[in-house]
Amino acid sequence: MVDIVVTGLSANSVPYIEALERQRALHADVVAGRAQDTVILLEHPSVYTAGRRTEPDDRPRDGTPVIDVDRGGRITWHGPGQLVGYPIVRLPEPLDVVAHVRRLEDALIALLAELGIASCRVDGRSGVWIRGTAPDGTPRDEKVAAIGVRVAERVTMHGFALNCSNALDAYDRIVPCGIRDAGVTSLSRVLGRTVTPADVVPLLRPHLVRALSNGSAMPATPALPSAAGARA
Protein backbone atom coordinates (compact mmCIF):
# COMPACT_ATOMS: atom_id res chain seq x y z
CA MET A 1 0.00 0.00 0.00
CA VAL A 2 1.18 3.54 -0.74
CA ASP A 3 0.72 6.37 1.75
CA ILE A 4 -0.27 9.72 0.17
CA VAL A 5 0.89 12.70 2.26
CA VAL A 6 -0.24 16.24 1.43
CA THR A 7 2.36 18.43 3.08
CA GLY A 8 1.94 21.96 1.75
CA LEU A 9 -0.47 23.62 -0.68
CA SER A 10 -1.19 27.25 -1.58
CA ALA A 11 -0.06 29.62 1.19
CA ASN A 12 1.64 26.68 2.95
CA SER A 13 3.90 25.87 -0.01
CA VAL A 14 7.22 24.23 0.85
CA PRO A 15 10.57 25.71 -0.29
CA TYR A 16 12.32 23.38 -2.71
CA ILE A 17 15.45 22.75 -0.62
CA GLU A 18 13.33 21.97 2.46
CA ALA A 19 11.28 19.48 0.43
CA LEU A 20 14.46 17.93 -0.96
CA GLU A 21 15.73 17.31 2.56
CA ARG A 22 12.39 15.72 3.47
CA GLN A 23 12.70 13.48 0.43
CA ARG A 24 16.20 12.39 1.38
CA ALA A 25 15.19 11.61 4.96
CA LEU A 26 12.14 9.62 3.85
CA HIS A 27 14.20 7.84 1.18
CA ALA A 28 16.64 6.68 3.86
CA ASP A 29 13.74 5.45 6.01
CA VAL A 30 12.16 3.50 3.13
CA VAL A 31 15.53 1.96 2.22
CA ALA A 32 16.02 0.91 5.85
CA GLY A 33 12.48 -0.46 6.17
CA ARG A 34 11.46 2.16 8.74
CA ALA A 35 8.78 3.73 6.52
CA GLN A 36 6.35 2.49 3.91
CA ASP A 37 6.14 3.65 0.31
CA THR A 38 4.97 7.27 0.33
CA VAL A 39 4.00 9.97 -2.15
CA ILE A 40 4.51 13.56 -0.97
CA LEU A 41 2.18 16.08 -2.63
CA LEU A 42 2.89 19.81 -2.34
CA GLU A 43 3.44 23.15 -4.02
CA HIS A 44 6.71 25.10 -4.12
CA PRO A 45 7.45 28.81 -4.17
CA SER A 46 8.77 29.80 -7.61
CA VAL A 47 12.06 28.05 -8.45
CA TYR A 48 13.97 26.61 -11.41
CA THR A 49 15.56 23.18 -11.01
CA ALA A 50 17.95 21.50 -13.42
CA GLY A 51 18.38 17.75 -13.84
CA ARG A 52 21.61 16.02 -14.80
CA ARG A 53 21.12 16.37 -18.58
CA THR A 54 20.50 20.14 -18.59
CA GLU A 55 22.46 22.00 -21.27
CA PRO A 56 23.87 25.53 -20.78
CA ASP A 57 21.51 26.93 -23.44
CA ASP A 58 18.48 25.55 -21.55
CA ARG A 59 19.08 27.89 -18.61
CA PRO A 60 17.84 31.46 -18.08
CA ARG A 61 20.12 33.94 -19.82
CA ASP A 62 19.60 36.68 -17.23
CA GLY A 63 21.38 34.97 -14.36
CA THR A 64 18.22 33.82 -12.59
CA PRO A 65 19.29 31.27 -9.93
CA VAL A 66 18.81 27.59 -10.76
CA ILE A 67 19.04 24.69 -8.30
CA ASP A 68 20.96 21.74 -9.76
CA VAL A 69 19.58 18.41 -8.59
CA ASP A 70 20.38 14.72 -8.98
CA ARG A 71 17.28 13.69 -10.92
CA GLY A 72 16.99 12.72 -14.56
CA GLY A 73 15.80 15.12 -17.21
CA ARG A 74 16.70 18.75 -17.81
CA ILE A 75 15.53 22.14 -16.55
CA THR A 76 12.01 22.92 -15.39
CA TRP A 77 10.09 25.35 -13.21
CA HIS A 78 8.09 24.81 -10.03
CA GLY A 79 5.83 27.34 -8.38
CA PRO A 80 2.41 28.36 -7.07
CA GLY A 81 -0.48 26.64 -8.82
CA GLN A 82 1.58 23.60 -9.83
CA LEU A 83 1.06 20.28 -8.02
CA VAL A 84 4.34 18.47 -7.38
CA GLY A 85 4.47 14.80 -6.40
CA TYR A 86 7.46 12.97 -4.95
CA PRO A 87 6.93 9.18 -4.84
CA ILE A 88 9.42 7.57 -2.47
CA VAL A 89 8.72 3.95 -3.33
CA ARG A 90 10.64 0.68 -3.50
CA LEU A 91 10.72 -0.70 -7.04
CA PRO A 92 10.13 -4.40 -7.70
CA GLU A 93 12.73 -6.75 -9.14
CA PRO A 94 13.91 -6.80 -11.86
CA LEU A 95 14.60 -3.08 -11.55
CA ASP A 96 12.88 -1.10 -14.33
CA VAL A 97 13.08 2.67 -13.95
CA VAL A 98 11.32 3.33 -17.26
CA ALA A 99 8.34 1.27 -16.08
CA HIS A 100 8.15 3.45 -12.96
CA VAL A 101 8.02 6.59 -15.12
CA ARG A 102 5.30 4.99 -17.26
CA ARG A 103 3.24 4.22 -14.15
CA LEU A 104 3.40 7.86 -13.09
CA GLU A 105 2.34 8.89 -16.59
CA ASP A 106 -0.54 6.42 -16.46
CA ALA A 107 -1.81 7.86 -13.17
CA LEU A 108 -1.73 11.39 -14.56
CA ILE A 109 -3.34 10.41 -17.87
CA ALA A 110 -6.15 8.71 -15.91
CA LEU A 111 -6.62 11.86 -13.82
CA LEU A 112 -6.86 14.04 -16.92
CA ALA A 113 -9.38 11.66 -18.47
CA GLU A 114 -11.51 12.00 -15.32
CA LEU A 115 -11.41 15.77 -15.85
CA GLY A 116 -12.47 15.34 -19.48
CA ILE A 117 -9.04 16.07 -20.98
CA ALA A 118 -7.54 13.83 -23.67
CA SER A 119 -3.81 13.45 -23.02
CA CYS A 120 -1.07 11.10 -24.14
CA ARG A 121 2.52 10.01 -24.03
CA VAL A 122 4.80 11.18 -26.83
CA ASP A 123 7.38 8.86 -28.36
CA GLY A 124 10.85 9.51 -26.96
CA ARG A 125 9.66 12.11 -24.42
CA SER A 126 8.69 11.62 -20.80
CA GLY A 127 5.75 13.34 -19.19
CA VAL A 128 2.11 13.85 -20.14
CA TRP A 129 1.15 15.79 -23.25
CA ILE A 130 -1.85 17.45 -24.84
CA ARG A 131 -2.23 18.04 -28.56
CA GLY A 132 -2.44 21.82 -28.88
CA THR A 133 -1.86 24.60 -31.38
CA ALA A 134 1.13 26.92 -31.77
CA PRO A 135 0.62 30.71 -32.15
CA ASP A 136 0.98 30.33 -35.92
CA GLY A 137 -1.88 27.81 -35.99
CA THR A 138 0.21 24.69 -36.56
CA PRO A 139 -0.35 21.61 -34.36
CA ARG A 140 2.12 21.13 -31.53
CA ASP A 141 2.53 19.03 -28.40
CA GLU A 142 2.06 20.88 -25.11
CA LYS A 143 3.40 19.41 -21.89
CA VAL A 144 1.01 19.53 -18.95
CA ALA A 145 3.07 17.32 -16.60
CA ALA A 146 6.84 16.88 -16.38
CA ILE A 147 8.54 13.83 -14.87
CA GLY A 148 12.10 13.35 -13.64
CA VAL A 149 13.23 10.67 -11.20
CA ARG A 150 16.22 9.17 -9.46
CA VAL A 151 16.60 5.65 -8.07
CA ALA A 152 19.08 4.66 -5.36
CA GLU A 153 19.09 1.30 -3.58
CA ARG A 154 15.90 0.42 -5.51
CA VAL A 155 13.97 3.32 -3.94
CA THR A 156 12.80 6.29 -6.01
CA MET A 157 13.07 10.03 -5.44
CA HIS A 158 11.81 13.14 -7.24
CA GLY A 159 8.75 12.62 -9.44
CA PHE A 160 6.22 14.74 -11.34
CA ALA A 161 5.03 18.34 -11.68
CA LEU A 162 1.47 18.90 -12.94
CA ASN A 163 0.52 22.37 -14.16
CA CYS A 164 -2.88 23.15 -12.60
CA SER A 165 -3.61 26.86 -12.15
CA ASN A 166 -0.11 28.32 -12.49
CA ALA A 167 0.84 31.06 -14.92
CA LEU A 168 3.06 29.84 -17.77
CA ASP A 169 5.30 32.86 -18.32
CA ALA A 170 8.11 31.42 -16.15
CA TYR A 171 8.71 28.86 -18.90
CA ASP A 172 9.53 31.66 -21.36
CA ARG A 173 12.92 32.16 -19.68
CA ILE A 174 14.10 28.57 -20.17
CA VAL A 175 13.91 25.72 -22.66
CA PRO A 176 11.48 23.52 -20.68
CA CYS A 177 12.89 20.00 -20.34
CA GLY A 178 15.28 20.92 -23.17
CA ILE A 179 12.53 20.57 -25.80
CA ARG A 180 12.38 23.42 -28.31
CA ASP A 181 9.62 22.24 -30.67
CA ALA A 182 6.82 21.94 -28.08
CA GLY A 183 4.89 24.14 -25.66
CA VAL A 184 3.54 23.98 -22.14
CA THR A 185 -0.02 24.23 -20.86
CA SER A 186 -2.08 23.79 -17.69
CA LEU A 187 -5.32 22.13 -16.64
CA SER A 188 -6.94 25.54 -16.13
CA ARG A 189 -5.93 26.74 -19.58
CA VAL A 190 -7.25 23.61 -21.28
CA LEU A 191 -10.54 23.55 -19.36
CA GLY A 192 -11.16 27.29 -19.43
CA ARG A 193 -11.74 27.42 -15.66
CA THR A 194 -9.56 27.50 -12.59
CA VAL A 195 -8.43 24.09 -11.35
CA THR A 196 -6.10 24.33 -8.35
CA PRO A 197 -3.75 21.74 -6.87
CA ALA A 198 -6.17 21.43 -3.93
CA ASP A 199 -8.94 20.55 -6.40
CA VAL A 200 -6.76 17.89 -8.02
CA VAL A 201 -5.39 16.08 -4.96
CA PRO A 202 -8.52 14.05 -4.04
CA LEU A 203 -8.98 13.02 -7.68
CA LEU A 204 -5.35 12.05 -8.18
CA ARG A 205 -4.96 10.09 -4.94
CA PRO A 206 -6.70 6.84 -6.08
CA HIS A 207 -4.90 6.88 -9.44
CA LEU A 208 -1.52 7.11 -7.70
CA VAL A 209 -2.39 4.36 -5.24
CA ARG A 210 -3.53 2.09 -8.09
CA ALA A 211 -0.46 2.77 -10.23
CA LEU A 212 2.16 2.51 -7.50
CA SER A 213 0.66 -0.37 -5.52
CA ASN A 214 0.90 -2.67 -8.52
CA GLY A 215 4.51 -2.21 -9.48
CA SER A 216 4.81 -5.43 -11.46
CA ALA A 217 2.05 -4.49 -13.92
CA MET A 218 3.15 -2.84 -17.17
CA PRO A 219 1.07 0.14 -18.29
CA ALA A 220 -0.88 -0.13 -21.51
CA THR A 221 -1.27 3.50 -22.60
CA PRO A 222 0.47 3.80 -26.00
CA ALA A 223 2.85 6.60 -26.97
CA LEU A 224 2.05 8.75 -30.01
CA PRO A 225 4.50 10.32 -32.48
CA SER A 226 5.29 13.95 -31.70
CA ALA A 227 3.26 16.58 -33.53
CA ALA A 228 6.52 17.98 -34.90
CA GLY A 229 7.43 14.55 -36.25
CA ALA A 230 4.00 14.12 -37.78
CA ARG A 231 4.49 17.39 -39.70
CA ALA A 232 7.94 16.43 -40.97
UniProtKB/Swiss-Prot annotation:
Enzyme Commission code(s) on record: 2.3.1.181
Pfam families for the chain: LplA-B_cat
GO cellular component: cytoplasm
Signal peptide extent: none
Main subcellular location: cytoplasm
Subcellular location, record wording: Cytoplasm
Source organism, top-level taxon: Bacteria
Residue positions binding substrate: R71, G72, G73, R74, I75, T76, W77, H78, A146, I147, G148, G159, F160, A161
BPL/LPL catalytic domain mapped to chain residues: 33-216
Catalytic reactions of this protein: octanoyl-[ACP] + L-lysyl-[protein] = N(6)-octanoyl-L-lysyl-[protein] + holo-[ACP] + H(+)
Keywords noted in UniProt: Acyltransferase, Cytoplasm, Transferase
Feature type site, description Lowers pKa of active site Cys: K143
GO MF annotations in UniProt: lipoyl(octanoyl) transferase activity
Pathway of action: Protein modification; protein lipoylation via endogenous pathway; protein N(6)-(lipoyl)lysine from octanoyl-[acyl-carrier-protein]: step 1/2
Coiled coil regions, renumbered to chain: none
Gene Ontology biological-process entries: protein modification process
Catalytic residues in the record: C177 (acyl-thioester intermediate)
Enzyme class: transferase
Additional information: In the reaction, the free carboxyl group of octanoic acid is attached via an amide linkage to the epsilon-amino group of a specific lysine residue of lipoyl domains of lipoate-dependent enzymes.
Record-stated family: Belongs to the LipB family.
Job description of the protein: Catalyzes the transfer of endogenously produced octanoic acid from octanoyl-acyl-carrier-protein onto the lipoyl domains of lipoate-dependent enzymes. Lipoyl-ACP can also act as a substrate although octanoyl-ACP is likely to be the physiological substrate.
Name of the protein in its database record: Octanoyltransferase
Organism: Clavibacter sepedonicus
Lineage, highest ranks first: Bacteria, Bacillati, Actinomycetota, Actinomycetes, Micrococcales
Gene: lipB
